[in-house]
């Protein structure tokens, strides 16, 4: 390990006067990934969170010291305190750090510091950035470039969401939710799409959000590269404002890297990418859906522009196992009413839910879709209510859980009962509201039929519930 760290230091100097780094909210995937990279670079890492999870367990195994409560004493010895966007200014550890004149910085500021002396590749966008980040990382690894990566979700092929490599490359998911991605100074920026989301950050103004993305892309040096999805009208509107080289990808005829002949069979997708020079590249993916073809083509575009050989690109994409909780097959199960397949998916925005439904329809056209949906946040349910009603009406059976509040107060008319009422009034599906999670297994067994595909959908604890179902059912 010492020799490895010496190799790193040839490229990336140590942060001056920083020995111990404390993370408040260390259990988040983005926070934990940065903490893991810094641990492996040789820094002392401490942290705090309200509960243990897989991220904290991994960090503890790597040598981090973590407290599962917030106390002033937790920051003892810290040179700097890193906070997640979920941590408020009245947190006792933040207050104590200010009193002791210890720098308090956002997660993205520390990520920017890790990126400072590296060739940074930042992947942003409303949807698809976690999967795209994972795909870029796997391509660069397959090409022998040994990249460092920090992702917001598990990279299944690597078994982790962060890794410290020896090369100059850093591949990172860029977070627009609090506009902190403006701290990053990458060499390559990818934007997958832009939709209204996290609008409280942008004062409810979509124009402000769009301008923030332009500012993010202008952080590139004049010789940097901006990679954009040509299928997204907002991105194409903004492309002329960036003032940097722009390369596009997508199904659009106008895309520089154009997707043709997409076909899906089950979990497999097949398609051809036509490169700017006319080269035709046949791609095989083992993750379903046109949205994943877009994610993969974004990654392919970055790699081709870097000069990576097709063999490494295509091998990495064919072997890509997905990102955590993205159309995650939990197994096939024999139930009293027949055999069913259970899939867990993180998508919690109407666009994300829609592409998951479309991937299921295209890959398993003869199966009924039974969705267990858990709305995430009252504010999102309120802001996107009509879109949720339309999208959720596409499934064959809808089991609706109560809104996962994520710390928010309830908002009148933005609850699951109101959603169910509006969906029922549309007349396409009759939702079943399940407020008591203990009843979920029984209700699922009542509604399923032989051959059904069950989608557990949402960003709250519906994933935990789906895994409890899988454990109770046992695989066939």
UniProtKB/Swiss-Prot annotation:
Residues spanning the signal sequence: none
One Gene Ontology term, aspect cellular component: cytoplasm
Tree of life domain: Bacteria
Entry keyword set: ATP-binding, Cell cycle, Cell division, Cell shape, Cell wall biogenesis/degradation, Cytoplasm, Ligase, Nucleotide-binding, Peptidoglycan synthesis
Main location: cytoplasm
Annotated Pfam families: Mur_ligase, Mur_ligase_C, Mur_ligase_M
Single GO BP term: peptidoglycan biosynthetic process
Sequence similarity: Belongs to the MurCDEF family.
Stated role: Cell wall formation.
Name under which the protein is recorded: UDP-N-acetylmuramate--L-alanine ligase
Source species: Histophilus somni (strain 2336)
Classification of source organism: Bacteria, Pseudomonadati, Pseudomonadota, Gammaproteobacteria, Pasteurellales
């Amino acid at each position: 390990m010492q020799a490895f760290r010496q190799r790193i230091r040839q490229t990336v100097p140590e942060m001056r006067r920083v020995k111990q780094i404390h993370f408040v909210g260390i259990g988040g995937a983005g926070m934990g990934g940065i903490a893991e990279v810094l641990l492996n670079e040789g820094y002392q890492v401490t942290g705090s969170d309200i509960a243990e999870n897989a991220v904290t367990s991994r960090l503890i195994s790597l040598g981090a010291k973590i407290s599962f409560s917030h106390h002033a004493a937790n920051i003892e010895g810290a040179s700097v305190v890193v906070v997640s966007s979920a941590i408020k200014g009245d947190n006792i550890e933040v207050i104590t750090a200010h009193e002791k004149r210890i720098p308090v910085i956002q997660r993205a500021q520390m990520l920017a510091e890790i990126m400072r002396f590296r060739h940074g590749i930042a992947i942003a966008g409303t949807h698809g950035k976690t999967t795209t980040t994972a795909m870029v990382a796997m391509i660069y690894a397959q090409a022998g470039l040994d990249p460092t990566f920090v992702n917001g979700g598990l990279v299944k092929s690597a078994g982790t969401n962060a890794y410290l490599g020896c090369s100059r490359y850093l591949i990172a998911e860029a977070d627009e939710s609090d506009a902190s991605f403006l701290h990053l100074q990458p060499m390559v920026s990818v934007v997958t799409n832009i939709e209204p989301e996290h609008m409280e950050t942008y004062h409810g103004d979509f124009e402000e959000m769009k301008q923030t993305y332009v500012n993010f892309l202008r952080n590139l040096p004049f010789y940097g590269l901006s990679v954009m999805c040509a299928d997204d009208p907002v991105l194409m509107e903004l492309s002329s404002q960036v003032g940097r080289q722009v390369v596009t990808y997508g199904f659009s005829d106008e895309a520089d890297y154009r997707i043709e002949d997409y076909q899906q069979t089950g979990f497999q997708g097949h398609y051809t990418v036509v490169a700017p020079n006319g080269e035709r590249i046949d791609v095989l993916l083992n993750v379903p859906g046109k949205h994943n073809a877009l994610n993969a083509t974004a990654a392919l575009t970055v790699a081709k522009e870097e000069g990576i050989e097709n063999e490494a690109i295509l091998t990495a994409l064919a072997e890509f196992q997905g990102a955590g909780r993205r159309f995650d097959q939990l197994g096939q199960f024999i139930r009293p009413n027949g055999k069913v397949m259970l899939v867990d998916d993180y998508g919690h925005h109407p666009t994300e839910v829609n592409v998951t439904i479309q991937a299921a329809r295209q890959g398993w056209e003869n199966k009924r879709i039974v969705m267990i949906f858990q709305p995430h946040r009252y504010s999102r349910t309120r802001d996107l209510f009509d879109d949720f009603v339309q999208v959720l009406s596409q499934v064959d059976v809808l089991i609706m859980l109560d809104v996962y509040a994520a710390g928010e107060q309830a908002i009148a008319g933005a609850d699951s009962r109101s959603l169910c009422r509006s969906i029922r009034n549309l007349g396409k599906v009759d939702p079943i509201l399940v407020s008591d999670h203990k009843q979920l297994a029984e209700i699922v067994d009542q509604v399923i039929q032989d051959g059904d595909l069950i989608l557990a959908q949402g960003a709250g604890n519906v994933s935990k519930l789906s895994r409890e179902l899988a454990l109770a059912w046992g695989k066939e």
